Amino acid sequence: MTEELADNYRHIIAGLGEDPDREGLRDTPKRAAKAMQFLTQGYGQTLESLVNGAVFESQTDEMVLIKDIELYSMCEHHLLPFIGKCHIAYLPEGRVLGLSKFARIVDMYARRMQIQENLTRQIAEAVQQVTQARGVGVIIEAQHMCMMMRGVEKQNSSMKTSVMLGAFRNNLTTRQEFLTLVHG
């Protein structure tokens, strides 16, 4: 697949009026193909293999928050990156998830071509599915290169999305605690 992608990048470079055989661009198609495969490796991962049984019994029933998980993803509309951070909170119901698994879940879904709104929902639903928590809240704050580098060219703009499930959606106090912890 890398060879086919590299050939496609070679055609794109030539289509832009550049010489793909000139010194600075000679290896660019291969490098770009490898980069794209890395940036979209989430397609080859599953939630089950990623979590790998790292769900543990716990009597904890208070909110657990993992803040500032760095992420980058590819906008499905322009194939340009969006870069930001994700905050995940959940209310355990007898089980907790290994801490590193939250970052791995974020990475798995972020490393696919999509929009931020869907990414936020995918992360929330995955955490809910794995933990069977009483509630899950996810907030993503990101800057989109498709809006910063082209189109309206607004370099200081950012987008925030949230998904609230269970108690985070139905209980205003729980939602407010989450928002205060994230922004406080």
UniProtKB/Swiss-Prot annotation:
Keyword flag GTP-binding: yes
Gene Ontology cellular-component annotations: cytoplasm
Class in the EC hierarchy, top level: hydrolase
Catalytic activity, EC: 3.5.4.16
Catalysed reaction, written as an equation: GTP + H2O = 7,8-dihydroneopterin 3'-triphosphate + formate + H(+)
Protein's UniProt keywords contain Hydrolase: yes
GO terms, biological process: one-carbon metabolic process; tetrahydrobiopterin biosynthetic process; tetrahydrofolate biosynthetic process
GO molecular function, one term: zinc ion binding
Positions bound to Zn(2+): 75, 78, 146
UniProt-listed InterPro entries: GTP-CH-I_C/QueF, GTP-CH-I_N, GTP_CycHdrlase_I, GTP_CycHdrlase_I_CS, GTP_CycHdrlase_I_dom
Annotated NCBIfam families: folE, PRK09347.1-2, PRK09347.1-3
Subunit structure: Toroid-shaped homodecamer, composed of two pentamers of five dimers.
Name listed for the protein in its UniProt record: GTP cyclohydrolase 1
Species of origin: Chromohalobacter salexigens (strain ATCC BAA-138 / DSM 3043 / CIP 106854 / NCIMB 13768 / 1H11)
Lineage: Bacteria, Pseudomonadati, Pseudomonadota, Gammaproteobacteria, Oceanospirillales
Gene name of the record: folE
